[in-house]
A protein has these predicted regions:
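N-terminal "domain-start" segment that seeds a small globular fold
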Residues: 1-21, 41
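Conserved helix-turn-beta segment immediately C-terminal to the redox Cys motif
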Residues: 26-27, 35-36, 40-64, 84-87
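Acidic-and-aromatic substrate-binding clefts and catalytic sites of carbohydrate-active enzymes
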Residues: 37-40, 68-71, 144
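Thiol-based oxidoreductase modules, predominantly thioredoxin-like and allied folds used
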Residues: 57-74, 90-101
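Short, internal strand/loop/helix patches
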Residues: 77-122
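Thiol-/selenol-based redox modules, centered on thioredoxin-like
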Residues: 108-159
Length: 159
C-alpha cells in the first residue's frame, strides 16, 4: 500500500500544527530520534546529509521519541540544546512523539508503510518523495550514509 503524508498533521517545536503537505515538492527524511541511544551518533551524519542535500531539496525532520528504553526523557528545549551543542544540528526538530503502541502522528500514518508495524527502535527512517508519498522505510541500523539510503535520496531529488 502506498502511504501519502500530504494531510498528516504534526506538532512543530513551537507547538503549532503543520501538515506535512507543506513540504510538497521537497524530499523528506523523517527520523525518530533519542539523545541517550546507541544510535545517537547518527545525528552527526544526519547533519552532514542536511549540509549536502538541503540546497537540493532534502528536508530532515527529527521527531524525538522516548518509547524505546526511555532514551529521550528530556524536554524539547533540552533536546534541541543537546543537538545543536554536540552535533551542530540545523535541521528541524519537532515535538516529541510516540512511534509505537498508542502512536502519534506522523507515526500513526508512517507505521502503515511496508513492512507494516510499529517503528522498531530509535533512528528508523522514512523517505518521502516530492509528491508526499512514502518511498522507503529504513531500519534503525541503516546509517545516514548507507549506499541504499543515499541512492534513494538522490533518485527522489532527481525525480
Amino acid at each position: 500500500m502506498q502511504v501519502d503524508v500530504q494531510n498528516t498533521t504534526v506538532i512543530s517545536a513551537d507547538g503549532s500544527s503543520i501538515k506535512l503537505g507543506k513540504y510538497s515538492g521537497e524530499v523528506i527524511l523523517v527520523v525518530n530520534v533519542a539523545s541517550y541511544c546507541g544510535n545517537t551518533a547518527q545525528y552527526e551524519d544526519l547533519q552532514k546529509l542536511h549540509d549536502l542535500y538541503s540546497s537540493k531539496g532534502l528536508r530532515i525532520l527529527a521527531f524525538p521519541c522516548n518509547d524505546f528504553g526511555k532514551q529521550e526523557p528530556d524536554s524539547l528545549s533540552e533536546i534541541k540544546d543537546f543537538c545543536t551543542t554536540k552535533y551542530g544540528v540545523e535541521f528541524e526538530i519537532y515535538e516529541k512523539v510516540h512511534a509505537k503502541g498508542n502512536t502519534t502522528e506522523p507515526y500513526t500514518t508512517l507505521n502503515k508503510v511496508e513492512p507494516e508495524g510499529d517503528v522498531e527502535w530509535n533512528f528508523e527512517k522514512f523517505l518521502i518523495g516530492k509528491d508526499s508519498k512514502v518511498i522507503a522505510r529504513f531500519k534503525p541500523g541503516v546509517k545516514p550514509f548507507d549506499e541504499n539510503l543515499i541512492a534513494a535520496i538522490e533518485v527522489a531529488l532527481d525525480s
